Design a protein with these regions (language model features):
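Eukaryotic phosphotyrosine signaling hubs
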Residues: 5, 62-67, 129, 184-189
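Conserved, structured core segments of small domains
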Residues: 50-55, 60, 68, 72-75, ...
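Vicinal oxygen chelate
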Residues: 3, 7-10, 48-52, 81, ...
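Short hydrophobic/aromatic beta-strand micro-patches
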Residues: 11, 68-72, 133-135, 190-194
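Short, conserved charged micro-motifs
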Residues: 16-20, 74-80, 139-141, 196-202
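Intrinsically disordered, low-complexity segments enriched in Gly and acidic/Ser/Thr residues
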Residues: 180, 186, 190, 196-201, ...
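Hydrophobic, helix-prone linear segments
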Residues: 1-47, 51-63
Length: 244
């Protein structure tokens, strides 16, 4: 009786433009109700969608969450970087060392992502979208293990990672110290209630696990916004609602 991860949601200044960028990088079909809400339909290896909604303000600091893309060869890594740059990405410096093999880029709205070097054993078998990498404590990693019911696949030196039982991207947390948040997060998780549970029942379960309410109910068909133990917002959708 655990929640389902429906999507990783980006708050964007131009949702359609950002969605087209990520569709070009990740592949997949775009759907949605207009320019303010666009969905990148999940692929089989991913299991969750990527949603783009209107609402991003000025970027005040490094995001708490980013995508790690994998490579099968040096040529493949270069091709992913070149393709991303051609679609509107740019190189950025977030303190990575010259000897590190991954390439750090930002999408057209400044959201960081990494193109990981080939041979990375931790992400082996995870698919092209290898991980959703988060800045967060061990406590929050254990919270999300319980929230989603995904097995804990890494738990060392305060770093944690979970992965769906059927495989796909890992969700990782880098451990303490956790960077101070700079305003409301641009990326967040969107959940739907588990089987046999309604929205309020799911909210109550998540609160019992350590989440806190940051906004009240938004009506019959609206999402409930919560915060995980590190203060990162996420939302629980109403039953039968595919996105907020």
């Amino acid at each position: 009786m655990t929640a389902n991860l429906v999507a990783v949601c980006f708050a964007a200044g131009e949702p359609l433009r950002l969605a087209r960028f990520w569709a070009g990088v990740l592949g997949g079909e775009l759907t949605g109700g207009g320019r303010d809400v666009v969905v990148l339909v999940p692929r089989g290896e991913t299991g969750f969608g990527v949603r783009f909604v209107s609402g991003s303000g000025p970027k005040l600091g490094q995001n708490q969450m980013h995508f790690d893309l994998t490579s099968v060869s040096p040529a493949d890594q270069r091709a992913t970087v070149a393709k991303s740059l051609g679609l509107g990405a740019r190189h950025i410096d977030i303190g990575q060392r010259p000897e590190e093999g991954h390439v750090v880029l930002a999408d057209p709205e400044g959201n960081e992502f990494c193109v990981i070097e080939p041979g990375n054993a931790f992400l082996e078998g995870c698919g092209f979208l290898g991980a959703v990498a988060c800045d967060g404590s061990r406590e929050v990693g254990l919270f999300w293990r319980a929230a989603l019911g995904w097995p804990l696949v890494w738990d060392q030196d305060e770093e944690t990672a979970i992965q769906a039982p059927g495989g796909g991207p890992k969700i990782t947390w880098g451990g303490s110290p956790v960077n101070a948040r700079a305003g409301k997060n641009r990326l967040r998780f969107e959940l739907s209630p588990g089987a046999g549970r309604d929205q309020e029942g799911e909210v109550e379960r998540l609160v019992a696990l350590g989440a806190g309410r940051v906004e009240g109910d938004r009506g019959v068909a609206g999402p409930v916004v919560l915060a995980d133990p590190d203060g990162n917002e996420f939302c629980v959708l109403a039953e039968g609602v595919a996105g907020s």
